[in-house]
Amino acid sequence: MAISRAQLAKELEPGLNALFGMEYGRYENQHSEIYTTESSDRAFEEEVMLSGFGAAPVKQEGSGVSFDDANESFTARYNHETIALAFAITEEAVEDNLYDRISARYTRELARSMAHTKQVKAAAVLNNAFDSTVTGGDGKELCATDHPLITGGTFANEPSVAADLNETSLEDALISIAGFVDERGLKIALRGTKLIIPRQLQFTAERLMSSVLRPATSDNDVNALRSMGMLPQGYTVNDFLTDTDAFFIMTDTPRGFLHFERTPLSTNMEADFDTGNMRYKARERYSFGFSDPRCVFGSPGA
């Protein structure tokens, strides 16, 4: 359906002081604080988790050396989605509007809608982090207490008891990250790099990260998180997170949160010969997801 003069009646009359409602600022590219962006030329992308060797055993004198096998553990798949939106304007609405270039106004609004959807899609990975029906390559949700290992054991990137963001829960999470193991149970050197929080926790995060002394105590102890340089990239607020007390710590895992761009954002405009309507369309294709769940440690909040 095209935007017609009936929908813009006030803009056809002289004496209108202002048009408003579409001049708000917008949250842009918050996904870049979390995701590494790569291009794609396929309908989907797959990444395979490899399993290396276990700990080397002792070889007894005169005995044969032990052999080990390498395997593929699981596959993470990124299915690209097509995101598109369009609008049309009648010839008469364009001709009779007295106040601005109506097409330019709604083209800007089209870009705003596309940008909003991208941020919602990016945040959905974290918003679904504790949902057992939304799983990654290993068959578990992003944050779980029982991610399976190929050796038969498990590892956890979620606390066994859900906790709110505070000094203790943050320190416990960083300790847990330092204890992560690979698919064969070997210790790996990972560290927390950045805290991801909803807007409701930004003041708590600032006190935890920036106070010289321990926050919320009368002790004269140093703030260990600050003095030890933990979380070197600080914290970032994501305004599209829906859980008001969940928090996440990103790690320096090589293949973690990924954003694949299949088709960059493009806009098109054409005239309909029969009606004279002008039609405008925006379209892009992309996917958001994660490969290695060791890329994050998350708590849903108490």
What are these regions (language model features)?
Residues T75-T133, L195, Y280-A282:
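Long, contiguous amphipathic alpha-helices that act as assembly "spine/axial" helices in icosahedral shell
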Residues H116-A156:
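Glycine-rich, mobile lid/loop segments that gate access to catalytic sites or pores
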Residues A2-A6, T37-E46, G64-F67, I89, ...:
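Short low-complexity stretches enriched in small and charged residues
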Residues M1-Y27:
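N-terminal alpha-helical "arm" segments
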Residues H80, D96, N128, G136, ...:
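Generic structural "secondary-structure junction" signal
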Residues A2-K10, E141-E183, A189-K194, Q200-A302:
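Sequence/fold signature of self-assembling virion shell proteins
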Residues G25-I83:
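Assembly/oligomerization interface modules of large self-assembling protein complexes
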Residues T75, R184-G185:
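A generic local secondary-structure boundary/capping motif
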